[in-house]
């Protein structure tokens, strides 16, 4: 993106809401800092992520990842193109710009997207800009989406359509998992199933205990008992 010098005579500045930010506005922007870091980790080093605060356009960049693509850092000013995207979205139903292409000062081709960050009053207080460097070799880009060459790539994920389905799918998988473990005796299977579900956080879901109790044909009080035993470190008990 080009970086026009911002002055008090810039027409765009007159269109911005000049009210000072309150603490809630700062808290909202602060919460997006983790989004910057997370997107950069997910997409890869070929993508620059910039969080702008509209409190002061002369030093609007408050969080940036992979800023080497444009030479920007925290404290850099907003760009003229970002301002244009802002004005296109101010008062509009959409808070996401169309994708657009531009060239950084270094000459690299960038594909970009700008997202407006609004407060409770729907006032735009910040911008999240995502800029992908298209001049990076394609093989380098693809390498960020390929799992490492290790035997244990990662755990499976249940993409359930509802929390009830999530509990059911996780429960059935856990039952199969415990039944296949020869180190778990028949008398201890229910207890081990509940332990595994507890470690997976499934009991944080409302009514999960009832679902588990019904499926295992035990009382919900037994499930509660097992959970208390796990929390206290006492793994003794009998299935009921």
From Swiss-Prot:
Superkingdom field: Bacteria
Residues annotated as signal peptide: none
One Pfam assignment: PAS_6
One GO term describing the cellular component: cytosol
InterPro entries with a match to the protein in the record: DauR-like, DauR-like_HTH, YheO
Family in the record: To H.influenzae HI_0575.
Name of this protein: Uncharacterized protein YheO
Provenance organism: Escherichia coli (strain K12)
């Amino acid at each position: 993106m080009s970086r026009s010098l911002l002055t008090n005579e810039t027409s765009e500045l007159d269109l911005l809401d000049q009210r000072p930010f309150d603490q809630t506005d700062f808290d909202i922007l602060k919460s997006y800092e983790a989004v910057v870091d997370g997107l950069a980790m997910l997409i890869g080093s070929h993508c620059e992520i910039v969080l702008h605060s509209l409190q002061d356009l002369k030093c609007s960049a408050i969080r940036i990842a992979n800023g080497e693509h444009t030479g920007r850092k925290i404290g850099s000013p907003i760009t003229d193109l970002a301002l244009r995207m802002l004005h296109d979205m101010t008062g509009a139903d959409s808070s996401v710009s169309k994708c657009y292409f531009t060239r950084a000062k270094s000459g690299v081709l960038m594909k970009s997207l700008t997202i407006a960050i609004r407060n409770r009053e729907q006032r735009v207080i910040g911008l999240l800009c995502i800029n992908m460097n298209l001049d990076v070799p394609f093989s380098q880009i693809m390498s960020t989406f390929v799992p490492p060459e290790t035997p244990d790539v990662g755990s499976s994920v249940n993409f359930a359509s509802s929390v009830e389905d999530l509990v059911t799918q996780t429960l059935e998988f856990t039952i199969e998992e415990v039944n296949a473990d020869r180190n778990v005796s028949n008398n201890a299977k229910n207890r081990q199933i509940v332990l595994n579900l507890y470690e997976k956080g499934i009991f944080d879901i409302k009514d999960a205990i009832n679902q588990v109790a019904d499926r295992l044909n035990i009382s919900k009080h037994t499930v509660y008992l097992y959970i208390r035993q796990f929390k206290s470190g006492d793994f003794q008990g009998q299935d009921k």
